[in-house]
Amino acid sequence: MVISGKELAAACKAKMAEQVKTFPEKYGRLPHLVVVLVGEDAGSVSYVTGKTKAADEVGILNTTIRKPADISEEELLKIIDDLNADDTVDGILIQLPLPKHIDSDKVIARIRQEKDVDGFHPLNVAALWQKQPCVLPCTPKGIMKLLKDSGVELAGRKAVVICLLYTSPSPRDCS
């Protein structure tokens, strides 16, 4: 079975665009996502470009903060502290991987839980494993939505998920 995600992606974007339209009525401004990109890894640059394009398409204000690979951990943490304190910033995304001299766990934990759009904050990960409400990591959430919307029956089936991401909850945990 081959499943195409194009229709689902289009439907998700349309729904998100409608939700974004109502945001200013409630908050007096557009939602604002800030992506922090450290270094010039080609894959990361491409991924961030895709994220900002998707945000633009649905009307989300977005800012990319680009820093050189030799930024200090202290400088990066200061940027996160400033974003956490900024009430006009609704979501923070740190593009991974970070350079080896920066502790990714420390950086991710520094983001306020409610501004963590990736679902990688330790409290979001803990809530996920405990099946509590939380920000769900997008990849397993997307997999489960795609399977569900495609009518794939998962009950009684077994699957193996091989994941090399920062955090790797199974798609089952995101259903």
What kind of feature is each model-predicted range?
Residues 93-159:
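Anion-binding alpha/beta catalytic cores of soluble intermediary-metabolism enzymes, centered on
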Residues 19, 45-58, 168:
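Short, solvent-exposed amphipathic alpha-helices that sit
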Residues 1-25:
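Positively charged, low-complexity intrinsically disordered leader regions
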Residues 166-175:
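Single conserved hydrophobic/aromatic residue that forms the stacking wall/gate
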Residues 56-67:
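Short beta-strand elements in bilobed, periplasmic/extracellular small-molecule ligand-binding domains
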Residues 75-86:
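Short, well-structured alpha-helical segments in soluble
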